[in-house]
Curated annotation (Swiss-Prot):
Disruption phenotype: No growth phenotype in phosphate-rich medium (3.6 mM Pi). In restricted medium (Sauton) grows better than wild-type even after nutrient starvation. Decreased phosphate uptake in phosphate-depleted medium. Decreased growth in infected BALB/c and C57BL/6 mice for up to 5 months after infection.
Lipid-attached positions, S-diacylglycerol cysteine: 23
Keyword terms, alphabetized: Cell membrane, Lipoprotein, Membrane, Palmitate, Phosphate transport, Signal, Transport, Virulence
GO molecular function: phosphate ion binding
Entry protein name: Phosphate-binding protein PstS 2
Topology in the lipid bilayer: Lipid-anchor
Annotated localization: Cell membrane
Amino acid sequence: MKFARSGAAVSLLAAGTLVLTACGGGTNSSSSGAGGTSGSVHCGGKKELHSSGSTAQENAMEQFVYAYVRSCPGYTLDYNANGSGAGVTQFLNNETDFAGSDVPLNPSTGQPDRSAERCGSPAWDLPTVFGPIAITYNIKGVSTLNLDGPTTAKIFNGTITVWNDPQIQALNSGTDLPPTPISVIFRSDKSGTSDNFQKYLDGASNGAWGKGASETFNGGVGVGASGNNGTSALLQTTDGSITYNEWSFAVGKQLNMAQIITSAGPDPVAITTESVGKTIAGAKIMGQGNDLVLDTSSFYRPTQPGSYPIVLATYEIVCSKYPDATTGTAVRAFMQAAIGPGQEGLDQYGSIPLPKSFQAKLAAAVNAIS
């Protein structure tokens, strides 16, 4: 978590639970939207919500909860960042009011049907938090590096083994790359970051990756380290190394980040709120109605120049109609706060504020929660 705010009390428990409570009582209504789309927060319902799930959402959730309690004094939300799988399980077991997840509900395991039984209505997957994944590197004397999908795939599967390989050098004219051996560093733990990074390699490499994607790194080369902290620490002490990190860790650790050449044009693209915002705005929805499941393959081969292609989309999984109306009212208010005032300064937490066009799509679904 980043910091505690004035006017609210924050406590982080050992289990990774965030509890943020505003001072004051009654209900309030506010309108805002860092992405540019304003919307009211209609406070009401039960006073304390419970949610759990994605650790990738943890920092953004602090901002969302802060926006909620500021908009609705006297209301709280308790979020336990215990992992996507645990969060979905607790939601399906009716132990929490909604779940945070790096992936939408999985039809192959019957999760949509189980959620419909739990809710008494269809559950909706609402993509709310978008975090770029950075390719980070440590090469002595090299401060800028351009990569594309095929070249990155060949690095991470061991096909390219030295930094001055002609395929890398061709993308970096004007930079004298050394003959240093490449040291690949990967996540040794199961990770949504690994899954999404490998989906990028699979989707953007024109067949050069050939390893598929999963929460376990499949490249077959390199050294593993646990978590973003572990990979970052090993990168910083290893000349010639390369890894992948959530953007917030790359910024926080002051790591060098590669710029990515995409299918949309020859110009390398860095991570910025604008470049990731273009990716989000161009996201294709393959869910039906207000179930906003994304086709993330559209991220990896963008058509709009200046779009950054490696982005992790995470979801809030909610009931479309809650058995208890007071819960539905409160969840709707929280989500209104999250996609409205909660977007302000979200990039300081490692996530990208929603662009106007996508914010409007999400608002229509959020406002329909009951």
